[in-house]
């Protein structure tokens, strides 16, 4: 069974994104061990740079020594769903390390977090709200698992 981790800034507040995230987390957990760690948002009164630094420090503190840090970033690598499935398969070959997908807050990820990344992944060329990005990531993790299992979820 694959082990995956999501490390994100802030809880999902919008009800329909909460429902979608719960839906995919429940589906993923039938075949994968998935944990989610949520760190507190930076202070809303802080300027974006200070807020990112604050959130970045929390994210780094929550990272484990065996995490394979994969940051979601608009400048990251774009992949097809099949490529992403292969990427997940390669990352989970070593059972002593855990892929940890890191999602920033409203202003993205601090450079200190991006410097810790072993991989940077883009969900596409467009920018998404961080709540939506979390749901898209969850769906793609579920899809990748279905592809790797040969389940009839993904259609080319």
Curated annotation (Swiss-Prot):
It catalyses: pseudouridine(1915) in 23S rRNA + S-adenosyl-L-methionine = N(3)-methylpseudouridine(1915) in 23S rRNA + S-adenosyl-L-homocysteine + H(+). It comes from the Bacteria. Keywords: Cytoplasm, Methyltransferase, rRNA processing, S-adenosyl-L-methionine, Transferase. Its EC number is 2.1.1.177. GO terms for cellular component: cytoplasm. Specifically methylates the pseudouridine at position 1915 (m3Psi1915) in 23S rRNA. This is Ribosomal RNA large subunit methyltransferase H.
């Amino acid at each position: 069974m694959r082990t995956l981790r999501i490390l994100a800034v802030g809880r999902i507040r919008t009800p329909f994104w909460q429902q979608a995230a719960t839906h995919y987390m429940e589906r993923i957990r039938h075949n994968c061990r998935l944990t989610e760690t949520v760190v507190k948002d930076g202070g809303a009164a802080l300027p974006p740079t200070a807020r990112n630094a604050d959130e970045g420090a929390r994210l780094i503190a929550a990272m484990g020594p065996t995490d394979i840090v994969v940051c979601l970033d608009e400048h990251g690598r774009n992949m097809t769903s099949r490529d992403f499935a292969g990427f997940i398969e390669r990352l989970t070959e070593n059972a002593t390390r855990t892929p940890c997908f890191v999602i920033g807050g409203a202003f993205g990820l601090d450079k200190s977090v991006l410097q810790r990344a072993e991989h940077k992944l883009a969900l596409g060329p467009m920018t998404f709200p961080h709540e939506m990005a979390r749901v898209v990531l969850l769906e793609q993790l579920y899809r990748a698992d279905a592809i790797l299992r040969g389940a009839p979820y993904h259609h080319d």
